[in-house]
Amino acid sequence: MTAGALVSGDVEDMRVSRVTISDVTFAADLSGALFWEEQRLLVVSDLHLEKGSSFASRGVLLPPYDTIATLGRLAAVISRHDPRTVIALGDSFHDRTAHERLSAEDRDAVAGLQSGRDWIWISGNHDPMLPRDLGGTVADEVAIGPITFRHEPTGAHGEIAGHLHPKARVSARGRSMERRCFASDGMRAVMPAFGAYAGGLSIRDAAFAKIFPKNGFVAHLLGDRRVHAIAASRCY
């Protein structure tokens, strides 16, 4: 599906639940995860666990429930897809000591999510030195077939990355809607942040132009019930 095909008709007719990158088709989950069914591989990005406690240490008080909320959402998406492998695509922890602030219950929750499956932590800019005591394996990037998984996008073909926390705003039927989104041109993709407090960056930011030339990409917005594919040129 091309961006040109997406700009005709009503926004409500542009609904998709699949994203194709370098001829590999992924299920785009409303949670912000991608699932590669053939590989039984689930990918999530930018969990930013313990962001609330990180802010609290600097005097910015947020409700201290982001980690439990994020892990709960992750448990739900794992239950839906039953992956053989999970890749956490960097910035899983908000800072270098965030893992030390996990409660015993949160550590048990992580162990439960890892049970019976392979788990890969990709290092990110927030967590370049990932802990070795939380199970799973640690890598800077992982290549499977034509797809390379890394945290920071380079614009390479076959790349799935995170880091930028894409979101998009669109108007339809007199209403404005801003949502997290996958950004993809079919050759590469940037995933939305999964974490409860992760926030987002507009796809109209110059950072995306470096990855997707001429705005020739699609924003796959996470709606209430399904994913909506909308040409980036229609977003603001």
Regions inferred by a protein language model and the residue ranges of each:
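Extended recognition/assembly regions associated with phosphoester-bond processing machinery
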Residues: 1-236
